[in-house]
Amino acid sequence: MDIKLIAIDLDGTLLHSDRTLSDENIQAIREAKEAGVQVILCTGRPLLAMNYLLDEIGLRDEGDLAITYNGGLIQKTQTGEVVRQMTLNREECIEVFELGRDLHLPVNFIDLKHIYEPPYPEGAESIYMSDRRKDTTKIDLQFKEVDIDNLPEPFFINKIVMSRPGEELDAMIPKIPAAYHDKFNIYKSQEFILEILPPSVDKGSAMRFIGEALGFEKHQIMGLGDQENDLTLVSEAGLGVAMDNAIPAVKEVADYITKSNNENGVAHAINKFVLKK
């Protein structure tokens, strides 16, 4: 198997549970890149929030790409230039805000620079990026209050999130009308984050787009992940790799189950299938 492209999720996959990056994973990725393999980090985060990882690994050269906002954006890591972008419009944002109000869940609109904060339901403030609010040195996007009745026109958003403790989200998700699932791509990216994206947006479609643009066949692509938002990343790769800590649904579609994120499962898979050592 001649792997030419590796697409790697971050949280729960490349990163340890304490969100650190191991020397083993860094070394494996660097060796793969030196061997001519295109390595792409895939995340729900904005590019600004992963620059330190790209720098540490060495993925900021000309030609390096990243999949951000769970597939809504493909960007050049060296310049931030947008290669492909899928967005939600003003009317769709209002529609999702009304859903949040009905479910008593807070809504945040997120673009390349801002986390917009329309009014939250009483007693249900958003916990999205709450840790970064406490430490302003870690804020990658700027929080900005917005009046839902006076949104700018045009108003294009990369993704919408509803962020509350997991048990609150789990209680409300079954109450989302089917019409919303038909119109949007809705899933939990983390225990406390529900994401709402354009219907055609996911990590797998972004991975496919890059593979086709670079002239790679499906069997030359490896995708690694652990959560619901990684399902297409794993299922649509020629070699789909699930972490040992992955949810059952991801393991079911995987071709191989590697070690856990805390055991450097990414390095293990790259060494086994790409570097052949």
Q: How should these model regions be labeled?
A:
Residues 25, 50-54, 172, 176, ...:
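Hydrophobic packing residues within well-ordered alpha-helices of enzyme cores
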Residues 62, 70, 180-182, 236-237, ...:
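Short, structured coil segments at secondary-structure junctions
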Residues 1-5, 16, 22, 195-277:
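Mg2+-dependent phosphoryl-transfer enzymes with acidic/Ser/Thr/Gly-rich catalytic loops
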Residues 19-36, 85-92, 145, 198-212, ...:
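Short, acidic loop-to-helix structural element flanking the phosphoryl-transfer center
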Residues 32, 43, 70, 160, ...:
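Residue-level signal for inorganic ion chemistry
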Residues 23-129:
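Active-site phosphate-binding/coordination module
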Residues 99, 103-224:
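Conserved acidic, metal-coordinating active-site core of Asp-based
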Residues 36-40, 62-64, 159, 219-220, ...:
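Short active-site oxyanion
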